A protein has these predicted regions:
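Active-site neighborhoods and metal-handling regions in enzymes and metal-associated proteins
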Residues: 1-385
Length: 385
């Protein structure tokens, strides 16, 4: 069994969830988020692209309904003992099979919370669930319950986060060895991802973002590779990933001599990062974090070039994204708590001058000032050859 946490850790998590369920007066929950299943049981798969559901009750039952392809996956990677299979066939309805399973679990008329807000729940499944369960039980949206619990990391989780951060640093060191005029983006990506795999890391929740020249202004991955010019810019956003826990980083590297605009934008990003660090303390909100970022950026005249969010929580995430909640945007009332892992990204994209500048790193919050998990310098990275 490939469990990455102690039995005591899993028991503590289930106890936390049952306490929240009791407070919310829920008899059971239907878990569709792969992150929830991994956190609660260790179950590790990308099989959530198909229908699967983990039913948990306040009495302590855990029953997984999944496909045959994931039966052994659940046995090998989780502490779930009751694994049931829905059958692939022409008129198969896993929702009806789930309803029958809930009846067998004596949950007719129960109060059941459902995880709707997750990539493991399609609109079609949601419609079918609502149609079948509305008259069967008292159902409600419980999407935020486990994410709120996952946001604060345990000591066992923090060990993996620190390892992910170490791998993220190694990935950037590997990239800097490759970045030069004439370098191919493919070799840079290969070096970064190779450093993480060689260090025992995992695939991240989404692709690494890489773009040079005009495409250095992009915040998402896209297909196609480019060779760096004599004077160029390349934006990298990547994450070390270990046991699915992420530590993200972001840098724009200047190839050749930085322009005055690069220097101006870097100064704004550096000041903004310093400002948000003062807000990464218990009692502040994720809205406060964003406000600190916006104030510094706007003071440098960067309002039209910045984004409307400047970071987010990180943890054990699955595709299609390593981004977790809460997110730092204006007015978000979510509170900063000790032992959160938060990625702060200062992103400036000036389409007028075709200039990019980014600066980002991951922090662990404490009872006081935050701890940066990276050992990389915050200087503007420049490669001249």
């Amino acid at each position: 069994m490939a469990l990455h946490f102690s039995d005591a850790e899993f028991e503590r998590r289930f106890d936390e969830l049952k306490a929240v369920m009791e407070a919310e007066k829920l008899d059971a929950m239907l878990l569709f988020a792969q992150e929830s299943m991994y956190w609660l049981t260790g179950y590790d798969t990308f099989g959530f692209c198909f229908f699967q559901c983990l039913v948990v009750t306040r009495d302590g039952e855990k029953v997984l309904l999944t496909r045959s392809a994931d039966q052994r996956q659940a046995r090998h990677t989780s502490n779930i003992s009751d694994i049931r299979i829905w059958i692939d066939r022409g008129a198969a309805s896993p929702v009806l099979q789930l309803k029958d399973m809930l009846f067998d679990m004596d949950l007719l008329g129960a109060r059941i919370g459902i995880e709707y807000d997750t990539h493991g729940m399609t609109g079609k499944i949601a419609l079918q669930l609502n149609s079948e369960l509305t008259s069967f039980a008292n159902i409600s949206d419980a999407s935020e319950l486990i994410p709120d619990l996952r946001a604060v990391k345990s000591e066992e989780e923090i060990v993996y986060v620190r390892k992910a951060a170490e791998l993220a640093d190694k990935a950037f060191d590997a990239a800097m060895e490759e970045i030069r005029p004439g370098a191919d983006e493919g070799r840079i990506l290969s070096a970064m991802q190779g450093a993480i795999f060689e260090g025992g890391g995992d695939y991240p929740g989404n692709e690494f973002i890489i773009g040079s020249g005009h495409d250095a202004l992009l915040c998402r991955y896209k297909a196609g590779r480019r060779v760096l010019g004599e004077r160029d810019q390349i934006t990298l956003e990547w994450a070390g990933s270990y046991r699915h826990y992420h530590a993200a980083m972001m840098r724009t590297v200047v190839v050749g001599t930085p322009t005055d605009r690069h220097q101006e934008m870097y100064q704004a990003a550096r000041e903004a990062l310093a400002a948000v660090e003062t807000q990464l303390v218990p009692g502040k909100t994720f809205g406060d974090i964003f406000d600190a970022h916006a104030e510094r950026m706007d003071a440098h005249g960067m309002m039209q070039h910045r984004l409307n969010a400047c970071g987010y929580s990180l943890g054990a995430r699955f595709t299609p994204s390593w981004m977790d909640t809460p997110m730092a945007y204006r007015g978000n009332p979510a509170e900063v708590k000790a032992n959160m892992v938060i990625f702060m990204h200062m992103i400036l994209m000036d389409s007028i001058t075709d200039t990019a500048m980014t600066l980002g790193q991951t922090y662990l919050t404490t009872d006081g000032a935050p701890e940066c998990l990276s050992t990389l310098p915050l200087d503007l990275p420049v490669k001249s050859g």
